């Protein structure tokens, strides 16, 4: 059997396109949750007994560090993080107020340190729970779309074959045009990755810091909505299901003229490549090399989209020519005269047929190559690039000014309000997190005793803090 019986480049690239979008979204969710909770992703999930971020079972360490902070010299008094080092230094005698402070507030100081450790432990547990929800949502969505898609393709192949052959090029043309539009939008998705990361970060952080949310499963709040408690499961589940079903529809449409045996290998290889890219994106999401890779991948995707757009128009024109020939597809007979509409032809060569000539099928599947170009296919190819360039230019202007000049504001009102809401939510999130940090870590140098209004810690110049 031929190689085309086991592998289809069309199915491979279609499924790769959709699966890449899925893994990128899931990777963004994981990255933002990890950064939002400020936890390390290595130790807590390797099964080691000493997980990073968990509190030490020795509770005396907190008391020792607190005492060491009060015993530290003036040069170390403003650095809380160096209290453990200061404990090893030569101690100085405590004055009366400091002794009163340690005696009267030792339990409170230990409770503050214990609460800080418990907060860190809760973050680790919360991250573990959210990570499981995100991965499980993506996995269940992928499984469900494969089950639905498998049944859809099987029924479509066995029942709709005869109906397909009557208007084959219409179906292929329309689906190619739709696929081109989807790829073009996904290219903007890659180019605007930084903005999308901020958008996802605001949305997900608003869920994390929601007062009504209960992602750790506290039984005292029984009124938590299902959509709030499992929001990190629902988002990747719906995304994976939607994108997966889109891939199945395109595979069932564009690849309908190919054998069923070519689907499994194409889908498995596309999934493997997407998984590798997702892991790479998750680990190196902020590196310069990844940004370069995204730009290169976007350029490659736009080449594919331009080819699909041109091929879609070419398919529609070919079907019109087939209808004029009483339903006989002359392009399947051969490459010579009579196999194409000479009234619409721009060029035609009697070889390099992308429909059946081996390696040229790769260029057809990727770049939309055809050995018989028409006026519509050539104009549509150039028009695609002109529209894309104008769209990117307008988006750059919008990024710079916040709106598009010389365009009625009423047409842009929805986008402007959306951008303002995201910016406001981002500022509120930063303000909220700063309040949390300030409330959980009040400087000890500002604490005052009952008997005096003078701060306990005096700087080296002798002035009170």
From Swiss-Prot:
TM segments?
Answer: 12-32, 136-156, 171-191, 290-310, 359-379
All ranges on the Vacuolar side of the membrane: 1-11, 157-170, 311-358
Entry keywords, A to Z: Ion transport, Iron, Iron transport, Membrane, Phosphoprotein, Transmembrane, Transmembrane helix, Transport, Vacuole
Q: How is the protein disposed in the membrane? A: Multi-pass membrane protein
Give its localization.
Vacuole membrane
Any Gene Ontology biological process: intracellular iron ion homeostasis
| GO annotations of cellular component type | endoplasmic reticulum; fungal-type vacuole membrane; high-affinity iron exporter complex; high-affinity iron permease complex; membrane raft; plasma membrane
Which coarse location class describes where this protein primarily resides? Answer: membrane
Which GO-annotated molecular functions does the record name? Answer: ferrous iron transmembrane transporter activity; iron ion transmembrane transporter activity
| Spans within the Cytoplasmic topological domain | 33-135, 192-289, 380-465
Q: Give the span(s) annotated as Disordered.
A: 44-66, 433-465
Task: Please list the residue ranges that the record marks as compositionally biased, kind Polar residues.
Answer: 46-66
Can you tell which superkingdom this protein's organism belongs to?
Eukaryota
Q: Which residues carry this modification: Phosphoserine?
A: 449, 453
Q: Which cysteines are joined by disulfide bonds?
A: none
Further comment: Present with 486 molecules/cell in log phase SD medium.
Q: What does this protein do?
A: High affinity iron transporter probably involved in transport of intravacuolar stores of iron.
Q: Which family does the entry's similarity section mention?
A: Belongs to the oxidase-dependent Fe transporter (OFeT) (TC 9.A.10.1) family.
Q: What PANTHER family does the annotation carry?
A: IRON TRANSPORTER FTH1
- What is known about its subunit structure? Interacts with FET5.
What name does UniProt use for this protein? Iron transporter FTH1
Species the sequence originates in? Saccharomyces cerevisiae (strain ATCC 204508 / S288c)
Upper classification of the source organism reads: Eukaryota, Fungi, Dikarya, Ascomycota, Saccharomycotina
Q: Which gene encodes it?
A: FTH1
């Amino acid at each position: 059997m031929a190689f085309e019986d086991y592998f289809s480049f069309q199915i491979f690239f279609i499924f790769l396109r959709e699966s890449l979008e899925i893994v990128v979204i899931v990777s963004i969710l994981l990255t933002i949750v990890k950064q939002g909770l400020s936890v390390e992703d290595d130790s807590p999930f390797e099964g080691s007994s000493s997980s990073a971020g968990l509190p030490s079972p020795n509770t005396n360490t907190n008391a020792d560090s607190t005492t060491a902070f009060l015993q530290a010299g003036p040069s170390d008094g403003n650095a809380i993080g160096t209290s453990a080092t200061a404990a090893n230094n030569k101690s100085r005698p405590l004055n009366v107020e400091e002794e009163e402070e340690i005696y009267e507030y030792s339990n409170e100081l230990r409770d503050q340190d214990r609460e800080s450790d418990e907060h860190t432990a809760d973050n680790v547990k919360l991250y573990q729970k959210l990570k499981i929800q995100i991965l499980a949502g993506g996995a269940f969505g992928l499984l469900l779309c494969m089950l639905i898609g498998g049944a859809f393709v099987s029924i479509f192949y066995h029942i709709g074959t005869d109906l397909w052959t009557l208007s084959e090029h219409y179906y292929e043309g329309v689906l190619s045009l739709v696929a081109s539009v989807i790829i073009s939008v996904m290219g903007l998705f890659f180019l605007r990755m930084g903005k999308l990361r901020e958008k996802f970060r605001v949305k997900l952080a608003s869920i994390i810091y929601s007062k009504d949310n209960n992602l750790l499963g506290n039984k005292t709040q029984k009124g938590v909505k299902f959509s709030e408690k499992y929001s990190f499961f629902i988002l990747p589940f719906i995304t994976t299901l939607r994108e997966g079903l889109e891939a199945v529809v395109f595979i069932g449409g564009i690849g309908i003229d190919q054998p069923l045996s070519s689907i499994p290998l194409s889908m498995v290889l596309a999934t493997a490549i997407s998984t590798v890219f997702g892991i790479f994106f998750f680990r190196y999401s902020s590196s310069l090399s990844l940004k370069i890779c995204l730009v290169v991948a976007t350029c490659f995707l736009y080449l594919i989209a331009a080819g699909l757009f041109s091929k879609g128009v070419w398919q529609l024109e070919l079907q019109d020519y087939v209808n004029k020939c009483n339903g006989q597809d002359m392009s399947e007979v051969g490459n010579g005269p009579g196999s194409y509409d000479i009234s619409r032809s721009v060029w035609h060569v009697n070889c390099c047929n992308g429909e059946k000539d081996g390696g040229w099928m790769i260029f057809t599947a990727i770049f939309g190559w055809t050995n018989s170009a028409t006026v519509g296919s050539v104009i549509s190819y150039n028009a695609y690039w002109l529209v894309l360039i104008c769209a990117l230019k307008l988006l750059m202007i919008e990024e710079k000014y916040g709106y598009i000049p010389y365009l009625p504001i009423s047409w842009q009102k929805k986008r402007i309000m959306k951008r303002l809401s995201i910016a406001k939510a981002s500022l509120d999130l930063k303000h909220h997190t700063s309040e949390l940090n300030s409330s959980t870590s009040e400087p000890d140098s500002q604490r005052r005793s009952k008997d005096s209004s003078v701060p306990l810690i005096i700087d080296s110049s002798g002035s009170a803090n």
